[in-house]
Amino acid sequence: MNIRMRSITIKKCLVMLLLIISSNISIAQDCLDTESYYQYIKNNGQPHLEYVLDKIRSHSVVSLGEDHWIDVHPQFLCDLITASAQDSTANIDAVAVEFGSERYQYLADSLIKSPVYREDLVFKILQYTPDDLGNPYKEYADVFKSVWENNQKKPENLRTRILLVDPAYIQDYFDGKDYVYTGSRDDNMFDIIRNYIIKRSHIVFYAGASHTLARINGTRQGDYYYNWPSAGFLLKSCYPQDVFIINLWGGQMGSKGYIENNQTRWNLIADGVIDKAFQKNGNKPVGFDLKDDFPLLRTETYFANPTIKLSNYGEKGSPYAKEQKLSDICDGIVFIKPVSEFNGIQLINIYDNEFIEKANKRTKGSCKTAEDILKTVKEWHPILQF
């Protein structure tokens, strides 16, 4: 190779190297400094219940994103319902929950109208949730009870309704029946909640974070991605001034529940950098907005999970961009208490004979009793407690 050709080759290599370096620099790096998060929380935080009540006063929809299968988040919802009932300026017109099929909305309405608490109606609702064997969870049942009990203390025009927002056809799908697809689960959530925004009502939308956050979700199918908008994305896109999205702080979630860790009990988000900031703040329950000056935390880091890989960030067709920040899909955070103090949700027997027979068919004969069902649910999610 002559000197001229060698010089051209070297120049090309240098150009390629500069392009690679510049592309990496263009993706901002996460802030992994506990002190920065602590100062932000100290300067911007307020008591967690009052924080959410303020958002209810100023928005039609306040979305609360929970971690499934743990006790603290639905317990917080119960506390919020009680606090709202004591302040008519922050009254909740309806609580929209993921754990209930719209097919059984009449049961939720019957509960609200009943002069006595009807646990049988609640258990019936929890049998027909978007899980094959229902949601036999005490803390979910407590949400219904909290709404009913607090309604007894309020005038009828201020009573809170419970909205069941999972589409009806899901139950037919579980049973192997023919069904009419009416849209995704997120589409259905959006359709129901939108009707209340139009009425200028105040709604608390409580569901898993994959539904409440304003993001596009996706899974790889064959050679490309199947992407769909979350209910939070649809709500925030259509009504940006009316919807406020809060994520409830928690641990690192796997497909079966929180991921165990010998040092911290559960794997912590971003290796515990922000949890240490909460600790430095006295582990006080706190809520705060994710403003422009919130230390940078990318969604890839926030949702990092060593046990599963749903989609590659930055891959062609993937809805997950490496540069996407948590503040792009979420408006605020509520910290309740240290994640190490979180426990699995408590299993309870909600099953009647009709559903046990249905569950036995759904599991091809492996769930013949309520005890069999609870044992199976526990096997699916070992974090759950008896």
Residues covered by each model-derived region:
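Compositional signal for N-terminal targeting/processing segments
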Residues: 27-386
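Bacterial Sec-dependent N-terminal signal peptides
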Residues: 1-33
